[in-house]
UniProtKB/Swiss-Prot annotation:
UniProt pathway annotation: Cofactor biosynthesis; coenzyme F420 biosynthesis; Cofactor biosynthesis; riboflavin biosynthesis
One Gene Ontology MF term: 2-amino-5-formylamino-6-(5-phosphoribosylamino)pyrimidin-4(3H)-one formate-lyase activity
Enzyme class of the recorded protein, top EC level: hydrolase
Protein name as it appears in the record: 2-amino-5-formylamino-6-ribosylaminopyrimidin-4(3H)-one 5'-monophosphate deformylase
Residue numbers binding Fe cation 1: 29, 40, 108
UniProt entry tagged with the keyword Hydrolase: yes
Cofactor(s) demanded: Fe(2+); Zn(2+)
Species this chain originates from: Methanococcus maripaludis (strain C7 / ATCC BAA-1331)
Cofactor comment: Requires one Fe(2+) ion for activity. Requires an additional second metal ion that could be Fe(2+) or Zn(2+).
Assembly mode: Homodimer.
GO biological process: F420-0 metabolic process; riboflavin biosynthetic process
Residues reported in the UniProt entry to bind Fe cation 2: 31, 40
């Protein structure tokens, strides 16, 4: 049996090896012209990996399936069961390498639908916590955060307009606005204020999110 040096490297302490970080987003969603279709997955992965590097917790990767409200039609999604089964796979294999606490960083609003199912996975020897970053779809916050992460095309901001791409702020998603008051309020805000890139805000938001999850990991130890 190899004697592993759990105290080596830049880590909070040896106990952090019992914590795993999972990124959750979506891979197949339109985000206007300036952001890629896998924006949510990339932002979640960027944040999760950086939190792992800073704390020493183990980055377990990104969940491939994603789910969505049936009335939000801006991409290709999967069932809640598909998402949960993938998370179960990561958790089961994480436990084989000594992880008993899991932090899921979710950057896709539709995935909040799995909340109740996630709670069912918790038991005495396995704790799972999901934190959500839910920004107005492809609007100012997400554009600015995308810039900070490095996935925004500034040249394509010229055509990043909800009058051209209906999913921006979900302004043109009529059914979603009719069935979800929160979506309608966000869409109204985009209609009134527009969408623009704020580089300073994007960098601030990214640092704030990373620091927030670093503290969550610290408290999970």
């Amino acid at each position: 049996m190899v004697d592993l040096r759990y105290g080596s490297g830049n880590i909070f302490n040896e106990k952090v090896h019992g914590i795993g970080i999972i990124a959750l987003g979506s891979f197949l969603e339109n985000h206007g012209s300036a952001l890629p279709i896998d924006t949510d997955a990339k932002i979640a992965s960027y944040i999760a990996l950086n939190v792992s590097i800073i704390t020493g917790a183990k980055f377990l990767g990104v969940v491939l399936p994603s789910t969505e409200y049936s009335y939000v039609k801006h991409g290709i999604h999967d069932s809640i069961k598909d998402v949960i089964n993938y998370i179960k796979y990561l958790v089961e294999n994480g436990r084989k390498i000594g992880i008993n606490k899991f932090l899921i960083i979710n950057c896709h609003g539709g995935n909040t639908l799995i909340k109740d199912e996630i709670s069912k996975l918790n038991h005495e020897n396995c704790f799972i916590r999901m934190e959500n970053v839910c920004l107005t779809h492809a609007a100012t916050d997400e554009v600015s955060l995308g810039y900070a992460v490095g996935i925004l095309s500034e040249d394509k901001m010229k055509t990043h307009d909800p009058e051209i791409y209906e999913e921006i702020g979900m302004v043109g998603l009529k059914e979603a606005r009719e069935k979800n008051e929160a979506i309608d309020l966000e869409a109204r805000s985009v209609e009134e204020n527009g969408v623009f890139l704020d580089r300073t805000h994007g960098r601030f938001l990214l640092n704030e999110l990373i620091n927030n999850y670093v503290e969550i990991v610290r408290n999970m130890i």
